[in-house]
Amino acid sequence: MRQQYDTSAPPAAFSVADAFMLRTALDALGGVRGLDTLDVACGHGSTARLLASGGARRTVGVDSCPERIRRARAHETGETGEAGAVEYHVADAAGMPQLGPFDLATAVYLFNQAHDRVALHAMFRAVRANLRPGARLLAIVPNPGAFPHVDWSPYGIRIVERTPGGDAPLLRARLETDPPVAFECREWAHADFAEAAVDAGFATVAWQPTRTPPACEIRDEPYWARYRSAPVSSLMNCVA
């Protein structure tokens, strides 16, 4: 569900809303200046760069795809060839090595990639093992139960098929880009995420209300009001 298409294209509405929701949560915590930060499933590095630009003492990005890490590093070095502010590692989230400890971790559409309950719990345990006591995990996760009742295509994503089975239903979907990008993920309930977090050792789990950016010429307030009535994602806030 991460945006794996051409990053020069304008971001989809759901991605814009996610970024705003995450920035708002970070601001409410007082920012990241002086913190050691970790971004899991970092993709091309946009969230990791956000953390680094906010004054984090150390920022580490982790992703299982070598090509996404290559592109993230290329964005960091740019034309100068100098090392960037983010340290990147190729690693599977469920088997992530000890890279910390960190004061804050972020994860955007990571946990819905878990193919079964064992993998889901392993992901949360790997993140928790890299956090200091009292550290925080901010995770953006998709909301379950939308298909076939809600059409998310105006916001940049379409659920094509839902197949029950396994520990969670399989969703086949696509990003409404040009060309479209197909992907699959599991439709975990929020209770499943919370259970895995508590099992991993997080002391508290909370869910923050969906927040959207201010209206603009492209997306007015009625547009965002419709989005908030059935949002793509929620923000999970866990304290170690």
Which stretches of residues belong to each language-model region?
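Conserved class I S-adenosyl-L-methionine
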Residues: 1-32, 46, 50
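A conserved beta-strand element that flanks and buttresses the S-adenosyl-L-methionine
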Residues: 106
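C-terminal lobe and adjacent flexible extensions of AdoMet/dcAdoMet transferase-like proteins
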Residues: 196, 200-240
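A short glycine-rich, Lys/Arg-flanked "PGG" loop and its adjoining helix->strand segment in the class I
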Residues: 121-133
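Short catalytic micro-motifs in class I SAM-dependent methyltransferases
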Residues: 109-113
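SAM-dependent methyltransferase
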Residues: 138-198
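Class I SAM-dependent methyltransferase SAM/SAH-binding core
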Residues: 38, 44-95
